[in-house]
Swiss-Prot record:
It is found in: Secreted, Extracellular space, Extracellular matrix. Residues 586-641, 874-922, 927-987, 988-1048, 1051-1115, 1127-1181 form the TSP type-1 domain. Zn(2+) binds at C249, H433, H437, H443. SUPFAM superfamilies: Metalloproteases ('zincins'), catalytic domain, TSP-1 type 1 repeat. Residues 290-495 form the Peptidase M12B domain. It comes from Homo sapiens (Human). Keywords: Cleavage on pair of basic residues, Disulfide bond, Extracellular matrix, Glycoprotein, Hydrolase, Metal-binding, Metalloprotease, Protease, Repeat, Secreted, Signal, Zinc, Zymogen. This is A disintegrin and metalloproteinase with thrombospondin motifs 16. Residues 1186-1223 form the PLAC domain. PROSITE patterns: ADAM_MEPRO, PLAC, TSP1. It comes from the Eukaryota. Residues 25-279 form a propeptide. Its main location: secreted.
Amino acid sequence: MKPRARGWRGLAALWMLLAQVAEQAPACAMGPAAAAPGSPSVPRPPPPAERPGWMEKGEYDLVSAYEVDHRGDYVSHEIMHHQRRRRAVPVSEVESLHLRLKGSRHDFHMDLRTSSSLVAPGFIVQTLGKTGTKSVQTLPPEDFCFYQGSLRSHRNSSVALSTCQGLSGMIRTEEADYFLRPLPSHLSWKLGRAAQGSSPSHVLYKRSTEPHAPGASEVLVTSRTWELAHQPLHSSDLRLGLPQKQHFCGRRKKYMPQPPKEDLFILPDEYKSCLRHKRSLLRSHRNEELNVETLVVVDKKMMQNHGHENITTYVLTILNMVSALFKDGTIGGNINIAIVGLILLEDEQPGLVISHHADHTLSSFCQWQSGLMGKDGTRHDHAILLTGLDICSWKNEPCDTLGFAPISGMCSKYRSCTINEDTGLGLAFTIAHESGHNFGMIHDGEGNMCKKSEGNIMSPTLAGRNGVFSWSPCSRQYLHKFLSTAQAICLADQPKPVKEYKYPEKLPGELYDANTQCKWQFGEKAKLCMLDFKKDICKALWCHRIGRKCETKFMPAAEGTICGHDMWCRGGQCVKYGDEGPKPTHGHWSDWSSWSPCSRTCGGGVSHRSRLCTNPKPSHGGKFCEGSTRTLKLCNSQKCPRDSVDFRAAQCAEHNSRRFRGRHYKWKPYTQVEDQDLCKLYCIAEGFDFFFSLSNKVKDGTPCSEDSRNVCIDGICERVGCDNVLGSDAVEDVCGVCNGNNSACTIHRGLYTKHHHTNQYYHMVTIPSGARSIRIYEMNVSTSYISVRNALRRYYLNGHWTVDWPGRYKFSGTTFDYRRSYNEPENLIATGPTNETLIVELLFQGRNPGVAWEYSMPRLGTEKQPPAQPSYTWAIVRSECSVSCGGGQMTVREGCYRDLKFQVNMSFCNPKTRPVTGLVPCKVSACPPSWSVGNWSACSRTCGGGAQSRPVQCTRRVHYDSEPVPASLCPQPAPSSRQACNSQSCPPAWSAGPWAECSHTCGKGWRKRAVACKSTNPSARAQLLPDAVCTSEPKPRMHEACLLQRCHKPKKLQWLVSAWSQCSVTCERGTQKRFLKCAEKYVSGKYRELASKKCSHLPKPSLELERACAPLPCPRHPPFAAAGPSRGSWFASPWSQCTASCGGGVQTRSVQCLAGGRPASGCLLHQKPSASLACNTHFCPIAEKKDAFCKDYFHWCYLVPQHGMCSHKFYGKQCCKTCSKSNL
C-alpha cells in the first residue's frame, strides 16, 4: 500500500546581513560573507569617519579582555581559540572557560561553556557528482570555538561568544544588551587608543546603537534569485485588502489523504532490530531526550541558487531553527534534531528523479535514501530532501505545495523521509510541519477538535496567530500516541554530545531587513508595502510589487525585523528596540485528577490518573512541564470466578455480531503470535483455519499471555512484578517466593541414563503435586521423546505412541513450554505449581544420551504463608555538602520507598506527609587558615633559564567568602612565590647582519649581508657554529634585489635631414642644398628640432648635402614677331612629378605666351605664372641598419603605432616591423 502523505507550503525569506563594524567581520562568523553569483552588486561601506552609531555617539567602552581562572585570578591575555590550545579535549566534553572584560565603565566576569547537540559525532558534508563522491568534509573538533554562559555580576544574564579570532558576540543583562568585537586596527587613531595608558583589545557597545535601517553601514547579500518574480501569479494572489492564504498541502483536498485506515505492509528490514522491544518508549525513556538522527540532502537546483561556498552554513542555519521548533514547550516532549550528515548533489544521481511532482519525487527519494548506509552499517532515523524547485503535490509543474511527507513514517527505513521546497528561512517551518506528519500528526481541524485557524504549525494554512507559531494540543496528542508505539524506539539512541556549529548571535530580522524578506517571498521587484494603510508586519508581512496593491502570505516578519522608528518585532509584537517582547511563561502541572475506574472487575485491571500542563500553559517560547502526564496502577488483582469468561475471549466475542467480509463468524482468541503482537487482538474463526487482527490493541489490563503477569496498556506489553506493581522488577525465586532467596524450598535434581528396548515407555521421575521450577531436558540430541502423564495414566504429552508438536501445553494447573528442534536437545519447562502428581517417562527410540530433571518443593510450614502487605514511606536523601567548611549547601530530595527497601513511584506515598526539599546550608563553621596561591605568571624567558612568580596569600573561608588573615596564622613554610623556569638550553639560531649598500644608485641592483649560525644562550657569549647546526628554521637570504630610485630615461635624440631647397636658378643649370638638424622624437612619433650641439655626441650620417639642378631650358626670343593689334596670353602646362619623395623636391611646368595657338609677344612679365614649385619638403628618416630578425609576432600589431606604443619595451619588440615602417 502506498504511504499516505502530507504537504506544507510556507514562508520564503531572504534577509539582510549588517556590515561589520568598520569593515571588520569576525573571523568565525557563520553568515554569508559575499554576494552569490547573480546577486546585486555589493556597495562598499563608507569610511569610518562617515559612519553614524556608537563611534560618533561615544556609547562604547574600550575594554581589555583576558582569561582568568574560576576564582577570577589572571591567567593570560592571549585569548585564542580554546580548542586549538587544547587539542586533546574531546568534542563531547563540555569545556569551561572564564574570561574578564575590563574597561572604564564595565567590568564583566564571564563563566562560559561549550555548546552542544546540533550535529552528531562524525558529522560529514559529502558532495556527489556524476561519477560519485567528489569531496568529503568534516568539522574538526578544533574548529568548534563557540561558548555560552553568564555573567557572575548580573542576575538573569546570558553570554554568547565566539573565540575564533578574538572575542565576538553578545552579552545580555537585565539593563541592556551589548555587542563585543575585536578593536579594528585602522580605528585605533579615531578612538584615541594611543593616548590611553592601557591597551584595550576589544570594543564593547550597546545593541541599541547598532544601525537598524538599510543604509551606509549595511551590505545587501542576495544568495538566491527567486524565479517566481518572472512567473504569472496564481488566481488567488492577494490584492489590496484581499489576503492570499498559503496552503501547506495545496488547495486540492483530494491530494490531502487521511492516515492509513488499515495496517501497512511492513517489510522485514523496515525498522531497526530494537523495534521488538516490548516496552513503551515514553515509559522506558520518560525523562530522557529523544534524538532524531537526521540526514539532509540538497538537490542540484538549490545548490545553484545558493552556491557551494554558502550552502552548508545556510542548511545548518535552517536545521538549527527546526531544532528550536521541536524544543518548543508546546510540543510536550523532549525531542532533539541531531544532524548526522549533509549530502550535496551537484549532478543527477542514478535512481533519484527530482521534478516538480512532489509525490513522484518523494517516492523516488524515499527509495533512494533507503539504500544509504554508513560504512559501519549505521543508518539515519530520518531523511530530509531540500529542493530549489517549485513543487506541486499533484502535477509536474509549479503550484502552491511546499512539502510532502508520509504520515507516521518516522523510524521506517522506507517511509521516514520528507521533501521540502526552499523558501528562505521560512523553510524551517516547512520542515517542522512535514516532520510532524512523519511523527503521525494530522492537520489541525481535519478529523480532530482543534481549529484550522489557530495559527499552529500543523494548521492547513500558514497563518501564525499574532506572529507566533506553536504546536496545538492535537499535535501534542498525535506525538504522544506515536511515541507510545514500539515503532518510535529508534529515537532512544543517545548520540554522544558534540559541540554545536555556531551561528550568528543576532536575530534573523537584524541580519536581513523586511525588503529582502519580501524579495524572497514575491521576487526581485518586491519590497515592503509602504502604501497608505497600516499593517502590523510582526503579524503578517505585507509586500508591494507593482501598481497600487499589496500582498501577503500570512507569515510574520522575522524576529528582530525593524517595524517602526526604534521598534522591532519580538514574539509577534512590535515593541521598543532592545525589549524582548512578551517574556516566556514556563508551564506548570495542574493537580492530579482522581483515579479512573478500573478497566476490569477482577483478574487485574488498570486505573490511571492524569494532569495537564495548564497551571499555567507554556507560552511565548516557555518550556513544557517536565515529567509524565499520566500515572498508572494495577487494580482489582483478585482472581476471577472459575465460570467467568476469559477477558481476551470476551473481546473477540464482541465481534461475533459484526459482519466480516460479508458474513458473521464466531471468534475466539488466537495467541500463537510474535512477541511484538501480543497486545493486538488476534482472533481465529471457529471452524475455519484463518485468523485476523480485529483491533490494533486489546483493552487495558488484558494479560499479555496466559502464563505471564504482564498486562497490555495502550497496545504495549508492560512489565508487572510478582508484587503486582506495574513496572516493578520483582521476580519469584525457584521456590515461587516474590523477591525470595531460594531458601523456602528444596531443589530436587537427577539424571536418567538407562538404556532399554526401543518403542517402549520407561519411567524416569515422579514429580509430586505442588512442584515448581520444573525443568526436564536432554543432555544431547537423540531420537527418543519425553512423555508426561498423571497417576491415572492420562497422557498430556507424547502419549500412546503419538508425538505432539512443540508448543505450550496447559495441564496440571500450570503451563508447560515444550521445545523440540532437529538440531537442539529436547526440553520441557514449567513454572508451577502443579496440582497433581506427574509421571515423566521416556519413549525410547535408540541410544540414550541422558535426560536431566529438576524441580523444587516447599519446605514444611512455608507453603501457605500469605505474602506481607507492603508499606510505603517517604524518605529523605541528602547530598554531600558542597564544601567541607566555611559555609556550603546540600540538596535534599524526597523518595517513596516500599518496605524501606525499594524506591517506587511517588504516587504510592501519602502526598500530605511529603517532606520539604530543596537547598539547605551546611558546614557553616569557618575554615582553618590556609595558603591561597594564584597561577604562575609567564616565564621571563622561553629558554636559557628564566623566572616566574605567583601571588601567595594567607586566607580563611568564612560564610561563603574568603578573607585575608596574617601570614603567621597559616602553616609554615609558605608556598614558594618565585621559581626558575625554562632552564633548557636555547637552540642555536641564525644571526643576520645589516644589509650593504645597493650596487646601483638607480634602477634595479643587488645588496648582500652576512648570515651566520650562532648560539643564543643568554648566559654565555654568542659563538659561531657550523651552518648545519641551525636546522630549526631556514637560513635567511644573503642576497636580495634593491631599487633606490628609478633611472631617468635618456632622450631619444637623432640627426634628421631637411628637405632640398629650391634650385638656385629658374632655368638652365643651378644647385640645391639641404641641412642636417638635431631633433628629439616623441612617443607619438613626432619630432622636435633642437640645437645642433645637443646631438654633438652622435655621429653625423654621411649624406650628400648639395646637388645640381636644371629645372627648364631658358626660352629664346623668336626671330620675328609679326606686328598686329592682338596681344598674347600666358599658358602653363601641368606640373611634372616631384623630383624627390622626401627631403624637398621640385615640380616644373612649361609657361608660354601664346595667341591663337601660336607663340606671341606682348605678355606682361609680372603676370607670368611660376614655372617651378617646391614639393615633399618633410624630413627624410635616417637610414638605419635593418634588423635581420625584425618582424611582427601578433596580428594586431597595426594598432601599436596608432596608440603611440612603439616606444614601449614589449610592444615595440613584438611589433618591430610595423613600428619601423611607422617612422618612415
